[in-house]
Amino acid sequence: MKKFLILTALAYVLAGCGGADVAPERSMAAIYSDAYENFNDGDYEAAADLFSQAEAEHPTDPYAPDALVMAAYSRYMDDDFSGALIATDRFMRFHPGHQDAPYILYLRGMCYYRQVSDVRREPGMSVYALQQFEQLRERFPSSEYAKNAENKINILKNYIAGKVMYSARTDMKRENWTSAITKLQSVVQTAAETVMTPEALYRLTQCYTAIGLPKQSSGYADMLRKNYPDNQWTKKLDK
């Protein structure tokens, strides 16, 4: 919200900064002002086109990066996520050290995050979103967007682990024990902090029991009891 209050003020400043000399092409101020008018009217597609035009026609203007930020955000608001990603790619290519780089990485993550779908489908967008948010956290840990990114990272890790668990349960129903074990172990090893880990440990005890390996089954049962003594999946062990 703070960014766009600043940009709103910028639009008014730009609208009033034209000099007496009029260039043959439209100035950054004129295009930007029209773009912001469309944005405020909710015509995000037209706004995005104009913001993109402003940046493309005046790439060396001091406000070109801001126009590109607004082009990306307008595409995002129009649910044109592929268009928003193209704009953010251009921003990071030409302005990687700009003060708005953390926001652009966050916006990239949100473009993928908004497309995350049913837990029964392939990870796809959730993996891409996670990569963007983790990059933001790593590159700009003190950014105001890093905290929001951290929340999204936790949600996405649980979501992705949920997808793996769904697939592992399906394998177990089909008695495809090797595949199920591989997937369950991946949850335990790479997503240990998620809420899916206790169930993954419990399912591993079932899988190893099913293939006649009681020692391995007992090992995972002990791990479950030690790390999650009061969890519902731990209580199932003794039933």
What are these regions (language model features)?
Residues 2-8:
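Sec-dependent signal peptide recognition
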Residues 5, 16-239:
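Acidic, polar-rich low-complexity tracts and alpha-helical solenoid repeat scaffolds
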Residues 9-14:
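Hydrophobic core
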